[in-house]
Amino acid sequence: MANLKEIRDRIVSVKNTRKITEAMRLVAAAKVRRAQDQVLKSRPFADKLARVLENIQSRVQFEAVDSPLLSKREVKSISLVCITADRGLCGGYNTNIIKKVEIRYAELVKQGYQPNLILVGKKAIGYFQNRKDRYVIKSTFKELEQVPTVKDSEGVTNEILAEFLSENSDRVEIIYTKFITLVSCAPVVQTLLPLDPQGIAEENDEIFRLTTKDSKLLVEKSNIEKSDSEKLPSDIVFEQSPDQLLDSLLPLYLQNQVLRALQESAASELACRMTAMNNASDNAKELASTLNLTYNKARQAAITQEILEVVGGSVV
């Protein structure tokens, strides 16, 4: 059995570690709330933009519009946009998304396509750059804001547009972590280009808000109600041609999709970190309790031994 000083030092170390993990949990919880608020603030613009595109589509057949972002050509090369975190200590968040990318990459190679990677986040960059012999990396992005903004999405969107419009990539897919609940998230694959505005909807999403009660974190769940689509008047006359309208709106639409993926990934990362730090705090508490018990047993054994030695000496 370890001596009393070693056990006591380990108890102090575990308690200090618990203070750190508890602080990280609270910081992550606060940032999750900020990330969700950012998603809510961006919804009105995203929703209105989707409605405008739907209404234009009802007036104009997209198939008849000559827009490069809508053109579907023979697919040879596919770009995969991978979104991970810049930091660790968030459970299996980074590992799960990297595994998803590896599986999708292997599927595309097996199907005869030529995939390449656009990496967002230091974890993805570090992992795939160490495996350059197996993966083609087009570009990398790192050190984005923890709560992504429009500025963060611009660089990624511009790279995606450049690859697609130059025909270096015939299709662009984004792989990110969809935020489901505070304790549940899942890697998903979504096709970004060529665009299909009918495939986007944010209605009836569940929003999970963090609240406090009796000094404990609680979760409140609410649904986003479906918004009424405002139909454009049937006699409206567009000053610009449909091509000009869509050339202006579709890049905004694409950037909104990238921003949404970044925001959901950020919320998922923070939720995973909060859960991981909560588990670490619980484990530290349990370990400290076990060490205290071990310490008390060792101390009791030492006292008993001293008493026996004193009694034995007096008898002699």
Curated annotation (Swiss-Prot):
Entry keyword annotation includes Membrane: yes
NCBIfam families attached to this UniProt entry: ATPsyn_F1gamma, PRK05621.1-2
Gene Ontology CC: one annotated term: plasma membrane-derived thylakoid membrane
Record text on subunit structure and interactions: F-type ATPases have 2 components, CF(1) - the catalytic core - and CF(0) - the membrane proton channel. CF(1) has five subunits: alpha(3), beta(3), gamma(1), delta(1), epsilon(1). CF(0) has three main subunits: a, b and c.
Cell compartments where the protein resides: Cellular thylakoid membrane
Disulfide feature: none
Keywords: ATP synthesis, CF(1), Hydrogen ion transport, Ion transport, Membrane, Thylakoid, Transport
Function text: Produces ATP from ADP in the presence of a proton gradient across the membrane. The gamma chain is believed to be important in regulating ATPase activity and the flow of protons through the CF(0) complex.
Protein name: ATP synthase gamma chain
Record organism: Prochlorococcus marinus (strain MIT 9301)
Entry-linked HAMAP family: ATP_synth_gamma_bact
